[in-house]
Amino acid sequence: TPWLRVVGIGDRGLDGLSKEARELISTAEIVIGGKRHLSLMPKTAQEHIVWPSPISILLNKLTEFRGTKTCVLATGDPMCYGIGASLCKAFPIKEMIILPSPSALSLACARMGWPHQDVELVTLHGRPLAILRGYLQPLAKIVVLSNDENSPREVAELLTEQGFGNSQITVLEHMGGSSERRIEGIARSWNEKPGASFNTIAIEIFSSPETVLMTRHPGLEDD
């Protein structure tokens, strides 16, 4: 039986999980997660450990726990820009059970009515805002995993600077939870106060005649 359980959890906490996922958590001897994740857990005799930083410390700890029933709590889908990728590099998949919850991408597409295949996914977690530039094409639909509560304003400013000030921005906070909130606006006139640090941004790109388009692919333009 795999000793390492990786369970994706959403804003509803245990209430949003399957019976199998709840059992994997409740029967673990050690539960590791972010402060937000652990705050959703009931008080039990289990050892609760807050995710250390950097991630290498967590991987070293998990090596010490090898063979002990250990559950790592992740946000949404652990394999979608989550901890799952690092864990799969560190441990054989046969030693793990990974149970995802809906990802921020899935939830955002459901809220917006956008098919996954029509959407570009960009994460700003620990990445420069400038990476978004290469995705800015007229009528593109982009889901952005925010870095923090300031990301919506920073994205709106970048869009405006790049000539895409007409773009529609929708900020989705706490999707699936009781505090879920949706904020909509236009990039060039965005003046919303920072909200929840945990948010996802859905963008529909609209250009103007003077917009200069960029590409992610290097090279010269055709004559």
Question: Where on the chain are the PLM-derived regions?
Answer:
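Short, hinge-like loop/turn segments at secondary-structure boundaries
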Residues: 49-50, 113-117, 186-189
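Class I S-adenosyl-L-methionine
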Residues: 1-99, 106-107, 127-129, 136, ...
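Conserved beta-strand termini and adjacent loop/short-helix elements that scaffold enzyme active sites
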Residues: 51, 99-101, 122-124, 172-174
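Short, glycine-/small-residue-rich phosphate/pyrophosphate-handling segment
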Residues: 109-140, 147
